[in-house]
Amino acid sequence: MSWRASSSPAEPFDVAVIGGGINGAGIARDAAGRGLSVLLFEKDDLGGGTSANSTKLIHGGLRYLEYYEFRLVREALIEREILLGIAPHIIWPLRFVLPHHPGLRPAWLLRLGLFLYDHLGGRKALPATRRIDLTRSPLGAPLSPGRAIGFEYSDCWVEDSRLVLLNAKDAAERGASILPRMAVTSARREGALWHITAEAPHGQPAAFLARTLVNAAGPFVGEVQDGVIGSNQPARLRLVKGSHIVLPRLYDHDRAYIFQNADGRIIFAIPYERDFTLIGTTDEDHADPHETPRISDAEITYLCAAASSYFRVPIRREDIVWTYSGLRPLYDDGASKAQEATRDYVLKLEAPEGAAPLLSVFGGKITTYRKLAEAALAELRLRTEKAGWTARAPLPGGDFAPEGFAALLADFQRDFPNLSPDLSRRLLRAYGTRAWRIFTPGQDPGPPIGADLHAAELEYLRREEWAATPEDVLWRRSKLGLRFDAAAQARLARLMGG
């Protein structure tokens, strides 16, 4: 999957996007669907940075109410239901249990916050908040003694890196040129056009023209602005690291927990990949975007201690099976603490008269990427079809009702009886209705490469989803890395030419 053969310096694109995370992919999709010619550059794998290392929630952000970010919360709550409707295979409802901590926020304040949370966004698809007696409910069983009162509310889970992939794929199917592993080395204005030079690893530089340029490079937005483009505008960027730990499953039910801590922060404990529990996140300032974010010993201690103060069985660091960290490229609003920095997005337009415009994207949440894309195109004032189509058009594989997953799974198992129930469920959760394109009905899948990854799925990922390395397959197109042993990893590397 490469750029169109007609793409040449003589044929300008309407929009060029630097950055293949969720914001860049969302902008590319929206623009392509409005009939614009679109080019997207990503120096690494699509969704390989910030977007793949989130807490994997589509949520309003309950704690943002404490910082009076009512507009952000309302927009995110509205988007939560829209995204559930257009991508029900990779986004699904998740109930959260919030135990009351007598020494922290009073119960009346929690009730007030949850009342606002239920009503700010016009909730329709998800159930309302309810009070729980944790001394009698099974939901209280994993918790330490003394947790008497709790509240249960709704948000959604998302396969974050797949959300990026599906936006990029839909953009490509609508005519966009998506170029992963293609780094922009320079972009300069010449009148009403951007002259862009990009280079693939071990490849020759290629030249492109574009009428508008969007800098959605995430943690590298400042570097692109200063070094690649040469803009004089200051980049008010604050990098905040968020780290997570993954452990064997800590409890048997399907709810997530949200825990308050004495430092004012909250952490989540979330069912993960059926056999695990995900705990996170932290908030630490991070200086250098080139320094790969990794969990620190202090962060591990913090997450283990915070979760252990709520769970009946303490969390031990030796039980951790995986950790990951990501950088949030937040707009620097001058907040003194990393946890208080705004999660809202800020768009900066630089459009001198008669010159090609530049739009730089700061901040944002994965939940609000679609609205950010609409706002970005509105800022650029391109002559296009009307906004709003992305709220109605399903992402690839998402053309079924959110409540229809069980029926879809039954249909798939009927058509592919040779596949195990667990594999069928995983394929439907990853690919939705496009899972039918991976195997042919009645096909013997053959021996797996590792876990339940088969050659047919690997071929699909390489052909349709830009998968180029084992890491792409194991940690972004899926989370099979949690189940691949060393021998299976070596087999996969050989198959992929490693």
Positions of PLM-derived features:
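Extreme N-terminal leader/targeting segments of oxidoreductases
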Residues: 1-15, 30-33
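Short hydrophobic core segments
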Residues: 18, 208-218
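Glycine-rich Rossmann-fold phosphate-binding loop(s) that bind the pyrophosphate
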Residues: 20-21, 43
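Glycine-rich FAD pyrophosphate-binding loop
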Residues: 32-52
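Dinucleotide-binding Rossmann-like beta1-alpha1 core, especially the glycine-rich loop
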Residues: 56-140
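Helical element adjacent to the flavin cofactor pocket in flavoenzyme catalytic cores
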Residues: 151-207, 211
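C-terminal catalytic lobe of FAD-dependent flavoproteins
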Residues: 154, 160-162, 170, 229, ...
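Flavin (primarily FAD) binding-site architecture
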Residues: 215-230
